[in-house]
Amino acid sequence: MYDKKEDYRKSHMGASKPKEYDPQFWIPGATNHLFWQIERQILLDIMDCLKPRPKRALDFACGTGRVLSFLEGHVPETVGVDISGDMLKLARHRCQRSQIIEGDVTTNPDLLTGKFDLITAFRFFLNAQPELRQNVLAALRRVLADEGILVANFHLNPKSITGSYLRFRHWLKGSNRAMMSLKEAKDLLESSGYKPVEIRGYGYLFHRRKQVRFLRLRGPLEKALAKINPYPEVALNFIVAARLR
């Protein structure tokens, strides 16, 4: 967890960051590996509902190219942008045909050209400071097509079972941990000129460790709950699809 007093832009700088960050999504049995499997299906579901299908997609804060490499298989033209050159080294190796841009969209409005039918932003808004969140959403708004869609992921809901446990644990320690509820996420998007049109929750069970206990039982159950999408307000993670207002 980065120091909240620092600018979040600095949080993924450094040659060691890709090795620290990336493996958790690819190790079978890891909690984030399970969540990434679910996220891929949610992305597919959202894209399948778009008419016409997206022809040009941007993955904002693409990091090591996890989401971007997935989009390559489903969208004709894909672009990734990130401020961390260290993370992008792995993204360039992983992504076969995407245009990958290093830079800050909040300070360089000419960094991105043209409009995008689909923009994804995963694992960014939770830890970014409020001003940076607003500035990023404004920058993305400029390049989102009129009928395009923004798909944003939020990965630590305080109203979930796991979130409630973590809040209590940090309270005992006298510390804080960044969290964002579904209402807070919707308010953030709406205040920046977006209208949420679909919400998908996942991570309904209690997850205390980085590895999923009883994976053969809990893995399929988590996937089934994500498909049913009963109460995204109490899921650990959620994805919000939003259009321009």
Residues covered by each model-derived region:
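Conserved class I S-adenosyl-L-methionine
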Residues: 1-51, 54-61, 151-173
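Class I SAM-dependent methyltransferase SAM/SAH-binding core
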Residues: 64-107
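A conserved beta-strand element that flanks and buttresses the S-adenosyl-L-methionine
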Residues: 120
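A short glycine-rich, Lys/Arg-flanked "PGG" loop and its adjoining helix->strand segment in the class I
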Residues: 134-146
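A C-terminal cap/extension of S-adenosyl-L-methionine-dependent methyltransferases
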Residues: 167, 198-245
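Acceptor-substrate binding/catalytic loop of class I
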Residues: 168-184
